[in-house]
Each structure stands twice: as structure tokens, then as C-alpha cells.
């Protein structure tokens, strides 16, 4: 019941047993036996689509007296949590299909539906960094509606395997021309993007998914690899902070990607980088939003993450690439975490102003 899908078991078990995958199967069987998943589970698995259509409900939850308590009774959302709000200007509201130098290295920036709607500034920062690095950036989006592509990860985590397979299959098909052209597919949200390297195989999506898995890469991985090869020309200046305190997303750690995160942050002049020795933040997507899970969620965060964040001074920025990690950090400490793309964008702006 308390599996948060961190995949630490797969990393640490000598036989690489993936308990997160077993938990997905158990949830799927449970919903099948019940005749379907509860409404709250289905809504949380499609949050961006729900917010676009019924965003007024989220606003009423905050505005009406007792709105949070009512939402807890009806949807299971803990009244102590603040749910993500839709941005006034989503990323795809004003972006062309491709941007950057015509002769630059061609890459794909996959802006998922959550990043597009809830944190478009992260996508804009990543785009600015890639363009500054000389890339020609392709920005795929669905042709049949607003926003970015759903990856299927929230649905899969909830045990809604049919929905997850449908969403993932559409994404694989949309990216197939880019994969065939040899373009790296760059992602921003670790759990969503690393699904392309792992969980797609579980959904049985064939050779196209296998090919995509080999070209899916996180932003910090690409930048670290290019820098190590001597090919990265990114004009970075100092940032307003002296130290970056980094919380690694569970899936970054499970896939051994924290060295890439540290190497990318190390490109910023004068910035000391320190990683918090902590496990899961406890939010884990929709897990920490649910009232039944709130005590466990906060206990996980209080084990190491939140005490370290509270001790950080004003000269320290908190870096966390996971969207739900940043939500938990803010909820438990009042501090704002930032995606590495935003910190790199600040370093670009600093260099241009000097």
C-alpha cells in the first residue's frame, strides 16, 4: 500500500526485482476486481486534462469556506495540500514547432502535459539553454488539442494500464520520425521521461518503443555528456547564490544519473554543489496529495530532506528536478526549489548582463 514507485528496489536488489512494476500490476488487478478505479484515482491520473476543462473546481476549493474539506471528502485530496494551479500562459500557447539555429544540432525537447500547463517556465528555460548551446530544437505537441503529450506515467502509477498504454503508444508514434532521424529526445521531468527508458517495455509497445528508449535523455545528461566531450559552448556566468543544495529525484538516483546533475551544475562559475543524502521526498506524484497517505508522506520528507532544506541559508538555492519534489519542499519548508534548467537560464542571463 505504501509503495511510492521510487525504483530503489530495482537498483539495490541483486536480482533487480522491480517492486514498482509489481505494485502497478496489483493496483490494476484490484481495480479490475472492483469493476473500475475510484473517481479520485482516475481524476489524478489525468490532472492536466481535468484542470483545462474544470479548473474552476480547483479555484473553488481554495476560495470557498470549507472547500478544501469538501474536496477531501469527495476526491480524497488532503485539505492541508495546495494543488498545482494552471499557468496563465502555458508553454505551448506561444511556441513554434521548432526554434534555433538552422545549422545547429537537431534535438527534440519533449515538454510533457504537466510541465506545459503547471510549470511552463521550466520548459522555456530549457529551450533557452538548448538554443544558447547552438541546438535546433523541435517541439512536438499533439495536433488534436492544447498542451503537451501525456506520457502515461501518472496513469501507469495509478494502475490504469489501458489508459497508460494508450497515452504512451500515441507518444511513441509521434516521436517515431524524430527517433528515425537520430535526434535525442530530451526530457525535463525525471519520472515521466525515464518511463521512456524503462516502463514502455512493460506496456508491450514493441520495437518503436525500444528505439525511443535508447534516445530518451534528460536535459542534464545531454549537457554533461556534451561538456565531457568538449562540444558544449554554453556562455554561463555567476548566479546570485554561492551554493546549490540538490535533492535528487528517486528515478535520477535509480538510473545512476546524479553524477550528470552534479556535472551540469558544476558548469556554473563559482557555484558550490552539495547533494542532500535523502531518500524519497514522500510526495511521489499523486501519492502525497491523498489524505490517507499524508502522514507517511510527511514522515518521509522529515527523515532528511526537509531538515536539510530548513538549515540552508539565503546564499543557498535548492535544486530539485522533480515537480512533486519541489511541491513537497515548498509545503514542508516554505522554500522554493528550482529545476536545473532555471538555474542555467539564470547563469545565461548573468553572462549576458556583464
Residue spans for each PLM region:
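Cysteine-centered iron-sulfur cluster-binding motifs in ferredoxin-type domains/subunits
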Residues: 1-17, 251, 278-279
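Iron-sulfur cluster-binding electron-transfer modules in prokaryotic oxidoreductases
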Residues: 19-354
Amino acid at each position: 500500500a505504501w509503495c511510492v514507485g521510487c525504483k530503489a528496489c530495482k537498483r539495490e536488489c541483486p536480482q533487480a526485482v522491480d517492486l514498482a512494476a509489481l505494485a502497478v500490476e496489483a493496483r490494476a488487478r484490484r481495480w479490475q476486481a472492483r469493476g473500475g478505479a475510484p473517481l479520485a484515482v482516475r481524476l489524478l491520473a489525468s490532472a492536466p486534462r481535468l484542470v483545462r476543462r474544470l479548473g474552476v473546481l480547483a479555484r473553488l476549493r481554495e476560495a470557498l469556506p470549507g472547500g478544501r474539506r469538501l474536496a477531501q471528502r469527495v476526491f480524497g485530496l488532503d485539505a492541508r495540500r495546495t494543488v498545482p494551479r494552471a499557468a496563465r500562459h502555458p508553454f505551448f500557447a506561444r511556441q513554434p514547432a521548432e526554434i534555433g539555429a538552422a545549422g545547429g544540432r537537431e534535438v527534440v525537447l519533449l515538454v510533457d502535459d504537466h510541465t506545459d500547463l503547471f510549470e511552463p517556465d521550466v520548459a522555456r528555460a530549457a529551450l533557452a539553454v538548448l538554443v544558447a548551446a547552438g541546438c535546433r530544437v523541435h517541439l512536438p505537441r499533439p495536433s488534436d488539442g492544447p498542451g503537451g503529450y501525456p506520457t502515461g506515467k501518472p496513469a501507469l502509477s495509478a494502475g490504469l494500464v489501458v489508459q497508460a498504454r494508450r497515452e504512451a503508444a500515441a507518444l511513441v508514434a509521434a516521436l517515431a520520425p524524430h527517433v528515425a532521424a537520430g535526434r535525442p529526445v530530451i526530457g525535463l521531468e525525471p519520472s515521466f521521461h525515464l518511463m521512456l527508458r524503462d516502463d514502455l517495455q512493460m506496456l508491450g509497445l514493441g520495437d518503436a518503443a525500444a528505439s525511443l528508449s535508447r534516445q530518451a535523455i534528460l536535459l542534464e545528461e545531454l549537457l554533461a555528456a556534451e561538456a565531457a566531450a568538449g562540444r558544449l559552448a554554453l556562455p554561463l556566468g555567476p548566479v546570485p547564490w554561492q551554493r546549490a543544495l540538490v535533492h535528487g529525484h528517486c528515478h535520477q538516483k535509480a538510473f545512476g544519473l546524479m553524477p550528470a546533475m552534479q556535472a551540469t551544475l558544476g558548469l556554473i562559475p563559482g557555484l558550490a554543489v552539495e547533494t542532500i543524502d535523502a531518500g524519497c521526498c514522500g510526495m511521489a506524484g499523486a501519492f502525497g496529495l491523498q489524505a490517507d497517505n499524508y502522514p507517511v508522506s510527511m514522515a518521509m520528507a522529515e527523515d532528511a530532506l526537509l531538515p536539510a532544506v530548513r538549515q540552508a541559508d539565503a546564499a543557498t538555492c535548492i535544486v530539485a528536478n522533480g515537480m512533486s519534489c519541489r511541491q513537497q519542499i515548498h509545503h514542508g519548508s516554505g522554500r522554493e526549489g528550482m529545476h536545473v534548467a532555471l538555474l542555467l537560464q539564470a547563469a545565461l542571463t548573468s553572462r549576458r548582463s556583464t
